[in-house]
Regions:
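Extracellular polysaccharide-recognition and catalytic grooves
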Residues: 32-202
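N-terminal catalytic cores of secreted or lumenal carbohydrate-active enzymes
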Residues: 1-51
Length: 202
């Protein structure tokens, strides 16, 4: 997944360019790795410009990665491909539900993509569907801490899933927008992870 390559690329670049403190040996290793890693990221981004099939969540994930690659690497082709996808408009309705209604999985992937789009473009309008969805999700938490999934059109339908993968979204959006209810939700998710002995968040 190209998205998972980007944090490592940013780290290597920050060390190699001296934007982050590192000893000489680490800086040398990062400087050697950076062009190799950048070539991989560019190849992956180039492949994404050709798009193809895609459900709504794939489109937003691809558009967000392309926009971030444009921000980090330049390349007008990345932005052009992302813009073509974004012309379709968000599939998040006024209630905060995305088209696939996948509260147990794909809604949070859409949220991640919208957050990345906001960061990559500097356009805070991309936060709006995230806020609507996270607000809706506060009403989707069952008494046992799991998520209501019975209206999903995807494979999470009817499954018992806990909201741990929403943790960073609530934490980030709570901080960025100074929304105490989102920060409280992040704390409650962490407490639920502890209560149920769940694996740590990804």
């Amino acid at each position: 997944c190209t998205k998972r390559l980007l944090p490592v690329y940013v780290y290597l670049r920050r060390i190699a360019e001296g934007a982050q403190a590192a000893d000489a040996a680490e800086k040398d290793v990062c400087a050697q790795l950076l062009p190799l890693y950048e070539a991989i990221v560019k190849d992956a981004a180039e492949a994404l410009t050709h798009c193809g099939f895609h459900t709504p969540n794939h489109r937003w994930a691809i558009a967000s990665v392309l926009m971030m690659c444009h921000r980090l690497l330049g390349g007008e082709a990345y932005k052009k491909a992302a813009d073509a996808i974004l012309l379709e408009g968000s599939d998040c309705n006024a209630d905060g539900e995305y088209a696939e209604r996948s509260a147990g999985n794909y809604n949070r992937i859409n949220n991640d993509a919208m957050i990345m789009l906001a960061v990559a473009t500097g356009d805070d309008a991309y936060y709006e569907p995230v806020v609507r969805n996270l607000t809706m999700m506060l009403t989707y938490i069952e008494p046992d801490d799991s998520i209501f999934t019975n209206n999903s059109t995807r494979q999470d339908r009817g499954r018992k899933i806990y909201p741990k993968d929403y943790y960073f979204e609530y934490l980030y959006m709570g901080d960025v927008l100074q929304k105490p209810e989102f920060l409280d939700a992040a704390n409650e998710i962490m407490a639920a992870v502890d209560r149920h002995g769940l694996k740590a968040m990804d």
